[in-house]
């Protein structure tokens, strides 16, 4: 502030010195101007002064802010300290209390123990008192306790404490009395708090009681006021019914008789001026002069009319007080009140016509809503809503409601289009009456309006009527004028306005939709209102509308119940007889919903069915996905789909490359699932490669069967054999007793799998692959879980193309379209057949039909000129119970493994025109089971040898049998067919596969079918159907020219080779038996390749 003073002085000096220096600066010319320096100095000083002031202000603000912050921080610090102290005190008290309780319990226990030998009567009673603490602790406790009590006690309750006396007192006495004193103080404090709380509560209750009494008094006063007002209204009613108002001459009485007759007999005559609302501005101008003269008289008459109206609908409408009507009429006339609502009229207008009869005080009171329907011919219109006194002596206004069944049809064709005719009728009616009778002094309604209402007032919605009855101030306009011209004009205006606004007030204001009301007794009609003055359309009814429905709807509308919507479809569709209201262009359309309800119900049922199908499909798809290969997921994993255009390329590659290709087809959609039906129709028209899987990377060291894949036992009874007899038969029922190996989890899936018959075509005669229950039996083991499925239905014998064949993941299924080419799951040449290639283990006790499995495994493989080709050759083994049959040049071999351990089926697919065959390999060595003992391996070996010896002997004996009958066909049509085992075949585990010619397999199939008691004609049928279809993969051109005897010799050699191979595998798997089986030096080499190109069989073994 001090620094600002010089600046201010210098600024003032500068300002004063400025004007004298300016002329000097101008006069200087070229000489230096001293005034410029002065101006600069003044400018700088001003700037500095301003900055100084700003800095000072900022400094003040900062100081104030710092002061506030400091005060706030101090306050918070104090509050925090207080809070912390309170917390500490509370914790200390809790600790002390707990310690005191513990000490007391300890003393009690000690006393009991020490005084156990003393009788109970002589024992000292335990006195709960604190032990005597040391002197320092006692003083400290006393001081702290007194401080606490002084802090907690209010000032007026705080006792005067002599601290010196307390300090000098003995610690023992103080320690004893301290807690007692503290307890006493605490009790006093609590008592004082309770008293204060009680006082506050008493004050609140007293206040509430006073308020309640006041409210009750006010209610009583209001009730008294209302009762007085009611008495006044009664007096007014007496005045209304007195002789002065009811006295009429004979002419008026005659007119009323005519009017009554007109109302009841001929409503279409001149009294057809229906209830006209007083809502027009023209009416306002027309009636303006009438009501300016005598407002009081008008108010009385208006009140009387309102009272009559309230009697008309007294069950649901409030009664307007006469004082309110006086106030309202004095403030705003009735037409003004109504005209103010013209833009959004919520209420039904009523025109009150009143007639009195000479014989009694009763009245004929006609009231009608603004929405009416006029009948051109006047049929059944006067009966719709006429209020008249049925008993002249009662003086009560009663409502005569017509029987609503009597007028089902109500013509409204000219209801709103005859404004001119109505006007003329009104004019003629007005002429008939005398002007003197229309005077205001008569207090009578000379022109009662015939009420032709669509809905009677008690059927109207409650909202509009409530507002009307409190504000119905209409009097017949005739009462207000002595001139016929005015009457004509007003009637014309009334009719015109009727045409404009009559149609708008059917529903309560919450509908917000102007609609043309249709008669509750008439047929349902759709009436649209294009504008405020549009005429009603005479449209035919959309559908039948019984009267009770309309009545029901009207009653609902009166009670405020809206049945226009429901939970689902915004309408009460579940109510059988409810009529649906459709709002269309400010109109309502009522009709029944029976047909639509039925249709919607059907649609809902269909939707539910679709939902169920979808859920089932998803479940079955999940099943297929669960059973899918880990690496060859059926739907969305590594396998690449080969589309239709890529089939020739794969086939060509099969011709050229030396690597082995597993030409199989894995269906995208399982046949077990419901979705398989659609997938069959979609995928079959494509080439078979569309459903194939290219498995070079996904299965590097295995065949298309995944690492954890296995086939489990058949899960259904022998009754399935009868269902699936042709062309392939299920296994024997005795094989159902198999048990899964412990440690392997079998999951049973229920699902109906379609049994199908596959047709495979590939530029050569087709090979028929009948699909049977193997689709439900092909069980995949993924991640240690074996999924067993239920048997499928009976296989159809002739299923057209257009269906898919399902194989468990890793296997291949052939699409059955006759023009499809079998897709191949291609394995890399280097990894398809390693030296330690192993077939899948045979299903232990598996009743899975080998023929069934074969139906899923179309095995047609290209030439395998690799060193592994001999390894790929397999021997088709069958038990005495096994089944084998020939079908169209293809051998169906069936065999089983009885050992109840991990069961795996292996399928080897052979091309009868090729030497080498790509077998279905099982897993790599790490996944093979090592549990089988030496005795089990030896037993298997012996059983296999015995079986094959017996089978070869049977074949030589039955050289002219069915097997030999089709031997020459096999040389040309070789198809490696999966086994339909009804017998158990044991293969030493771990033994590698070898090949057997198709002639042997053919014979074995036929023999197995014979052993399984299959009729010969069915065997022939199966073989013939198989013969009609050729394997159509890339086969070499060198056609086999070996005879059946040569093929027998070759098969015998291959049989020996395979036996050696089994022994080798057994030794490799079980080194403990090496000493007994080291007699064969050929074990170190692979088996020789088959010399016959038609070698084709399937081997199922257990390892």
UniProtKB/Swiss-Prot annotation:
Protein name, as recorded: Centrosomal protein of 126 kDa
Subunit comment: Interacts with DCTN1.
Listed GO biological process terms: cilium assembly; cytoplasmic microtubule organization; mitotic spindle organization; non-motile cilium assembly
Keywords for this protein: Cell projection, Coiled coil, Cytoplasm, Cytoskeleton
Main location: other
Compartments where located: Midbody; Cytoplasm, Cytoskeleton, Microtubule organizing center, Centrosome; Cytoplasm, Cytoskeleton, Cilium basal body
SS bond partners: none
Record flagged with keyword Signal: no
């Amino acid at each position: 502030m001090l620094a600002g003073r010089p600046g201010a002085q210098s600024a003032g000096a500068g300002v004063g010195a400025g004007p004298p220096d300016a002329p000097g600066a101008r006069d200087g010319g070229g000489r230096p101007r001293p005034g410029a320096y002065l101006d600069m100095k003044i400018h700088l000083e001003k700037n500095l002064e301003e900055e100084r002031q700003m800095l000072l202000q900022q400094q003040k603000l900062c100081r104030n802010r710092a002061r506030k912050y400091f005060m706030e921080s101090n306050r918070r610090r104090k509050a925090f300290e207080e809070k912390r102290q309170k917390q500490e005190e509370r914790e200390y008290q809790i600790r002390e209390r707990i310690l005191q309780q513990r000490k007391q319990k300890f003393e009690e226990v000690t006393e009991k123990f020490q005084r156990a030998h003393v009788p109970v009567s002589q024992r000292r009673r335990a006195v709960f008192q604190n032990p005597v603490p040391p002197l320092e602790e006692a003083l400290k406790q006393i001081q702290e306790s007194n401080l606490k009590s002084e802090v907690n006690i209010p000032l007026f309750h705080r006792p005067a404490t002599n601290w010196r006396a307390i300090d000098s007192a003995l610690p023992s006495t103080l320690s004893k009395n301290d807690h007692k004193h503290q307890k006493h103080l605490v009790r006093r404090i609590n008592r004082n708090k309770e008293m204060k709380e009680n006082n506050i509560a008493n004050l609140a209750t007293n206040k509430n009681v006073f308020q309640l009494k006041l409210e009750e008094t006010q209610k009583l006063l209001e009730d008294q006021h209302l009762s007085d007002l009611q008495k006044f209204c009664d007096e007014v009613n007496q005045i209304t019914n007195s002789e002065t108002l009811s006295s009429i001459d004979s002419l008026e009485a005659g007119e009323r008789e005519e009017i009554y007759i007109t109302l009841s007999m001929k409503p279409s005559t001149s009294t057809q001026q229906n209830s006209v609302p007083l809502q027009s501005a023209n009416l306002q101008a027309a009636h303006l002069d009438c009501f300016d003269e005598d407002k009081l008289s008008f108010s009385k008459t208006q009140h009387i009319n309102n009272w009559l109206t309230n009697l008309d609908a007294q069950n649901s409408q409030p009664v307007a007080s006469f004082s309110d009507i006086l106030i309202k009429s004095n403030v705003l006339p009735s037409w003004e009140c109504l005209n103010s609502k013209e833009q959004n009229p919520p209420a039904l207008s009523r025109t009150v016509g009143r007639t009195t009869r000479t014989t009694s005080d009763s009245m004929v009171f006609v009231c009608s809503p603004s929405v009416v329907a006029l009948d051109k011919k006047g049929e059944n219109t006067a009966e719709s809503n006429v209020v008249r006194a049925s008993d002249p002596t009662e003086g009560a206004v009663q409502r005569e409601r017509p029987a609503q069944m009597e007028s089902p049809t109500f013509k409204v064709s000219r209801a709103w289009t005859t404004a001119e005719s109505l006007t003329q009728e009104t004019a003629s009616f007005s002429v008939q009456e005398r002007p003197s009778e229309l005077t205001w002094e008569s207090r009578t309604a000379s022109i009662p309006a015939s009420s032709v209402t669509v809905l009677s007032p008690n059927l109207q919605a409650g909202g509009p009527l409530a507002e009307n009855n409190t504000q119905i101030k209409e009097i017949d306009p005739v009462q207000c004028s002595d001139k016929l011209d005015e009457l004509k004009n007003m009637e014309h205006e009334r009719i015109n306005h009727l045409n404009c606004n009559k149609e708008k007030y059917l529903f309560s204001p919450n509908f917000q939709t102007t609609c043309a009301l249709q008669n509750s007794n008439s047929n349902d009609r759709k009436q649209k209102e294009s504008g405020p003055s549009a005429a009603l359309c005479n449209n035919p009814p959309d559908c039948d509308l019984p009267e009770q429905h309309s009545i029901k709807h009207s009653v609902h509308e009166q009670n405020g119940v809206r049945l226009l919507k429901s939970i689902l479809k915004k309408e009460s569709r579940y109510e059988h007889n409810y009529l649906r209201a459709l709002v269309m262009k400010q109109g309502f359309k009522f009709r029944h919903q029976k047909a639509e309800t039925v249709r919607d119900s059907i649609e809902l049922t269909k939707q539910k069915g679709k939902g169920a199908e979808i859920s089932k499909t998803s479940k079955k798809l999940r099943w297929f996905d669960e059973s899918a290969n880990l690496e060859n997921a059926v739907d969305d994993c590594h396998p690449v789909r080969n589309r239709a255009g890529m089939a020739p390329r794969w086939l060509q590659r099969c011709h050229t490359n030396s690597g082995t290709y597993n030409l199989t087809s894995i269906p995208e959609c399982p046949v077990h699932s419901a979705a398989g039906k659609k997938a069959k129709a979609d995928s079959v028209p494509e080439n078979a490669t569309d459903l194939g899987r290219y498995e070079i990377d996904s299965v590097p060291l295995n065949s298309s069967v995944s690492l954890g894949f296995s086939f489990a036992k058949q899960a259904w009874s022998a009754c399935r054999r009868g269902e699936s007899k042709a062309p392939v038969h299920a296994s024997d029922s005795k094989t159902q007793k198999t048990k899964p190996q412990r440690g392997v989890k079998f999951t049973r899936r229920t699902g109906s799998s379609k049994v199908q018959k596959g047709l495979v075509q590939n530029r050569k005669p087709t090979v028929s692959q009948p699909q049977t229950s193997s689709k439900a039996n092909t069980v995949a083991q993924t991640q240690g879980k074996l999924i067993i499925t239920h048997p499928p239905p009976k296989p159809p014998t002739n299923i057209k193309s257009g269906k898919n064949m399902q194989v468990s993941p890793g296997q291949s299924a052939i699409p059955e379209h006759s023009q499809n080419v079998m897709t191949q799951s291609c394995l890399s040449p280097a990894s398809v057949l390693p030296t330690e290639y192993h077939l899948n283990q045979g299903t232990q006790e598996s009743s899975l039909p080998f023929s069934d499995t074969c139906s899923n495994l179309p095995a047609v493989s290209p030439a395998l000129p690799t060193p592994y080709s001999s390894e790929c050759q397999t021997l088709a083994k069958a038990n005495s119970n096994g089944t084998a049959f020939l079908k169209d040049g293809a051998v169906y071999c069936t065999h089983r493994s009885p050992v109840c351990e991990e069961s795996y089926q292996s399928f080897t697919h052979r091309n009868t025109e090729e030497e080498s065959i790509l077998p279905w390999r099982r897993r790599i060595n790490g996944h093979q089971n090592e549990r089988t003992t030496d005795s089990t391996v030896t037993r298997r070996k012996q059983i296999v040898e015995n079986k094959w010896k017996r089978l070869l002997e049977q074949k030589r004996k039955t050289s002219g049998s069915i097997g030999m009958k089709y031997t020459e066909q096999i040389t040309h049509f070789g198809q490696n067919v999966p086994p339909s085992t009804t017998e158990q075949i044991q293969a030493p585990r771990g033994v590698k596969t070898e090949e057997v010619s198709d002639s042997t397999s053919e014979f074995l199939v036929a023999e197995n079918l014979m052993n399984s008691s299959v009729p010969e004609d069915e065997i022939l049928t199966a073989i013939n159907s198989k013969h009609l279809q050729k394997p159509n993969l890339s086969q070499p051109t060198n056609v086999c020219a070996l005879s059946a005897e040569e093929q027998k010799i070759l098969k015998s050699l291959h049989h020996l080779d395979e036996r050696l191979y089994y022994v080798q595998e057994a030794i490799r798997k079980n080194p403990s038996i090496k000493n007994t089986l080291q007699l064969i030096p050929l074990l170190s080499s692979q088996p020789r390749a088959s010399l016959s190109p038609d070698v084709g069989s399937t081997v199922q073994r257990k390892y």
